[in-house]
Amino acid sequence: LICSLEKFSGCENGKTIIIGAGKLGMALLEYSGFEEYGCTVSAAFDKKVTEPIKLDSGKVIYPMEDLSRFCRDNDIKIGIIAVPADAAQTVLNILCENGIKNIWTFAPVKLYKPADVLIRYENLALSLAHLKSQIIE
């Protein structure tokens, strides 16, 4: 069913990258459940990385300088933003400059985007607070 929906929607290519290789970015990079839904997390990028780092899983964390080439060579469609709020707008701008129009962000900040870019905001603290407000005792 998932394959049929992907083909119907034209979204067979779920090639994804992560920007930010801190704790959250690494957890997302190593999570294997995305592939079940047609998304392949290809790599991560981080400003603190100066040389590519290959993980035991085979995935690689690259320096930010490699982002443009990687996006061009790998037909990346989705970008995940896992950076602090003060860096998120810059990261979004870089992703947009590289043709990535589908964004999933964990940064707790409103981002300004071109009209043809889709952003899905994920606020983990807000989700937990919402659950807390509905505690059943």
Q: Where are the regions a protein language model picked out?
A:
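Hydrophobic, well-ordered beta-alpha structural blocks that scaffold small-molecule cofactor pockets
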Residues: 1-98, 106, 114-137
